[in-house]
Amino acid sequence: MNNVLIVSVIGPDRSGLVEQLAATIAAKNGNWLESSFSRLAGQFSGIVKVAVIGAGEEVLLALQQIAGLDIRGVLDVEREETALVSQSVALSLIGHDRVGIVKDVATILARFAVNIEKLETWLSSGAMSGEMMFHAQLILSAPLDVDLDQVHRQLECIADDLMVEWAD
């Protein structure tokens, strides 16, 4: 088993941040394994999985010296994948925006023991009405025995106009 450092990063966006992170990790013999980054409201945020030697303190301390970024890390042990006990499903939602819609979706998914592995949300202006439309793309991990039709019906009950689609 290998030690992995899970690093979260947030700070004002600027050119060259990913290069700076990658160079710092490589300089301390860390191996960049996986990552996900995004720019929201002028802020750069993301998470990186780094294979490290030992406890990874050198890598984390070096990263924390990068000016203007709030960097935190958690050390873990990379485990081999266990037998499949869940199914991966993609979900797409579109409906009129309103306060609490993400909470309502998350509550229903938790009720069925469905884990949100990835969530992307955004707003757009409705083509006909000009009203704000809520969009969500989710990657979920659901128990093999969960009734996805029942989950679908419960999600549709959130609002009359909410379109719910399982994606391929």
Residue ranges and their predicted role:
Residues 1-168:
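A conserved regulatory-domain signal marking ACT and ACT-like small-molecule sensing domains
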